[in-house]
From Swiss-Prot:
The lineage of its organism: Eukaryota, Metazoa, Chordata, Craniata, Vertebrata. One of its GO terms (cellular component) is cell surface. It comes from Mus musculus. SMART domains: IG (SM00409), IGc2 (SM00408). One of its GO terms (biological process) is platelet aggregation. Associated with Fc receptor gamma chain. The GPVI:FcRgamma complex is associated with the Src kinase family FYN and LYN. Interacts with TRAF4. Interacts with COL1A1, but not with COL4A4. Residues 22-265 are extracellular. SUPFAM superfamilies: Immunoglobulin. Keywords: Blood coagulation, Cell membrane, Disulfide bond, Glycoprotein, Hemostasis, Immunoglobulin domain, Membrane, Receptor, Repeat, Signal, Transmembrane, Transmembrane helix. Residues 287-313 are cytoplasmic. Residues 213-236 are annotated as: Disordered. Residues 1-21 form the signal peptide. This is Platelet glycoprotein VI.
Length: 313
């Protein structure tokens, strides 16, 4: 085997590794609504797609009816009913498209009159007792959503006959706070009522300070959080943590995973290129040494060769 063979073999392996790394599936971006995915009619909202650095092209699309824009954000100056629905985004690097982002549900609120929210038997509850929060709508809606200020999740109950009950079993200090509810029809899941007036639940016997009145921006909604809570006794739990959060405040930094993957790929490329250069230099040195050795051997053989006999006088 010639000295250059291992060099080209190592170069081939390195280049193949780089190609495999770069041709794998691109990580999915994140899609966020700013300031919130709950948008009152007439208000503005920005949908922003965030991916890794140096993206060639972004695509932001609305599902059903399908339409898209080749940009990383969508500004809606005035929220209308037609803007509500499911959105997702993706990006392109070279000839490869990324996986689509998680779907974001953009909700139009204030489409219908607000429901009323009350606590029974009272909004002042002794610790350890039970209380039921009742959300009642003037319309025959079959879906109700309850929010607690400070919680990122929501509690959803499919009900009929204009109202829904949200029982809280064995009240603790964690249940104190400000609540409000929405109502809507399952046939139009992205068109919600206006929020109810806030209800402050006070757990007596505790030195807890009531929370401030919430705003709609405090309540991000995700596809997972709008599903019914999986609780055996249908009680509200403030310890439940959501799986995903699609709405976020202004100025959120890009996800760490994208930068980490991009940095790792860049490191791998640099390491392979550095190793390739070193291997090439070693191969050239070995080939030069081999050539010099052969030349020296030829000279030695020439010196050791017997001289021809002298011609006879």
């Amino acid at each position: 085997m010639s000295p250059a063979s291992p060099t080209f073999f190592c170069i081939g392996l390195c280049v193949l590794q780089v190609i495999q790394t770069q041709s794998g599936p691109l990580p999915k971006p994140s899609l966020q609504a700013q300031p919130s995915s709950l948008v009152p009619l007439g208000q503005s909202v920005i949908l922003r797609c965030q991916g890794p650095p140096d993206v060639d092209l972004y695509r932001l699309e609305k599902l059903k009816p399908e339409k898209y824009e080749d940009q990383d954000f969508l500004f809606i100056p005035t929220m209308e009913r037609s803007n509500a629905g499911r959105y997702r985004c993706s990006y392109q690097n070279g000839s490869h498209w990324s996986l689509p982002s998680d779907q974001l549900e953009l909700i139009a609120t204030g489409v219908y009159a607000k429901p009323s929210l009350s606590a029974h038997p009272s909004s002042a509850v002794p610790q350890g007792r039970d209380v039921t929060l009742k959300c009642q709508s003037p319309y025959s809606f079959d879906e109700f959503v309850l929010y607690k200020e400070g919680d990122t999740g929501s509690y959803k109950r499919p009900e009929k006959w204009y109202r829904a009950n949200f029982p809280i079993i064995t009240v603790t200090a964690a249940h104190s706070g400000t609540y409000r509810c929405y109502s809507f029809s399952s046939s139009s899941p992205y068109l919600w009522s206006a929020p109810s007036d806030p209800l402050v639940l006070v757990v007596t016997g505790l030195s807890a300070t009531p929370s401030q009145v919430p705003t709609e921006e405090s309540f991000p909604v995700t596809e997972s959080s709008r599903r019914p809570s999986i609780l055996p006794t249908n009680k509200i739990s403030t310890t439940e943590k959501p799986m995903n959060i699609t709405a976020s405040p202004e100025g959120l930094s890009p996800p760490f995973g994208f930068a980490h993957q991009h940095y790792a790929k860049g490191n791998l490329v640099r390491i392979c290129l550095g190793a390739t250069i070193i291997i090439i230099l070693l191969g050239l040195l070995a080939e030069d040494w081999h050539s010099r050795k052969k030349c020296l051997q030829h000279r030695m053989r020439a010196l050791q060769r017997p001289l021809p006999p002298l011609p006879l006088a």
